[in-house]
C-alpha cells in the first residue's frame, strides 16, 4: 500500500449520476462523527504522530481537512452561481504551519460539522444539469461540480486513513 494514498487516488466515474452524489453525501454525513471518535480523546503525543516521515501531524491533518473542505465548499458554490469562474489554489503547506493549527482539533471538527451540513444540504438539491457546471482551478484546470462533490467525500476519507495509519505506528 502507498501510504500517500491509502484509499487509492480519487476515482470519478466518466458519467456521474445523482445516485453517485447521494453515495458521496452519505460518506460526508457520517464523517465528523467518525473523525471525532478517532481523534477526540487523543493526547498531545498522539496528536503529534505522523503517518510517514516528513508528513503532517495528526493535529495538522485535522486542521487541513477543515481548511480544505472550506475552500472546496466555496469553489462548489462559485461553480453553481458563476459562469466557469477561475479560483485560486491555496498553499496547503503554508496553511498547515499557520498559528491557528495549534488550536485544539475540536475547533476544526466543529467547523467541519457546519461546513459538511451545508455541503449535504446543497448537494441534496443538485440537479443533473448542475453536475456539469464547472470552475477553472488555477493549477488543475476545469473541475465540474460532480468531480468536486466526489473530491469532498474522498478527501475526508483519504486523510482519515492517514490519521489511522499514524495512530497505529
Residue ranges and their predicted role:
Residues 1-13, 48-92, 120, 132-169:
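Short, contiguous alpha-helical
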Residues 26-32, 38, 95-132:
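Acidic/histidine-rich alpha-helical segments that form the ligand environment
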Residues 22, 29, 55, 70, ...:
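A generic "functional-site adjacency" signal
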Residues 19-54:
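Short, contiguous, helix-prone interaction/anchoring segments in small proteins
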Residues 14-19, 27-32, 73-78, 114-116:
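Short low-complexity stretches enriched in small and charged residues
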Residues 16-19, 23-26, 82-85, 102-110, ...:
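Solvent-exposed interaction patches of small proteins and small membrane subunits
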Amino acid at each position: 500500500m502507498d501510504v500517500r494514498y491509502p484509499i487509492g487516488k480519487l476515482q470519478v466515474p466518466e458519467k456521474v449520476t445523482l445516485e453517485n452524489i447521494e453515495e458521496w453525501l452519505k460518506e460526508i454525513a457520517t464523517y465528523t462523527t467518525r473523525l471525532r471518535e478517532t481523534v477526540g480523546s487523543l493526547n498531545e503525543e498522539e496528536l503529534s504522530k505522523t503517518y510517514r516521515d516528513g508528513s503532517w501531524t495528526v493535529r495538522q491533518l485535522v486542521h487541513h481537512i477543515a481548511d480544505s473542505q472550506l475552500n472546496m465548499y466555496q469553489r462548489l458554490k462559485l461553480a453553481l452561481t458563476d459562469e466557469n469562474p477561475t479560483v485560486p489554489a491555496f498553499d496547503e503547506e503554508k496553511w498547515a504551519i499557520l498559528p491557528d493549527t495549534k488550536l485544539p482539533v475540536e475547533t476544526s471538527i466543529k467547523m467541519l460539522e457546519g461546513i459538511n451540513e451545508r455541503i449535504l444540504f446543497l448537494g441534496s438539491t443538485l440537479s443533473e444539469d448542475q453536475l456539469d457546471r464547472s470552475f477553472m482551478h488555477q493549477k488543475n484546470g476545469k473541475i465540474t461540480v460532480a468531480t468536486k462533490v466526489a473530491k469532498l467525500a474522498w478527501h475526508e476519507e483519504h486523510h482519515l486513513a492517514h490519521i489511522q495509519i499514524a495512530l497505529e505506528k
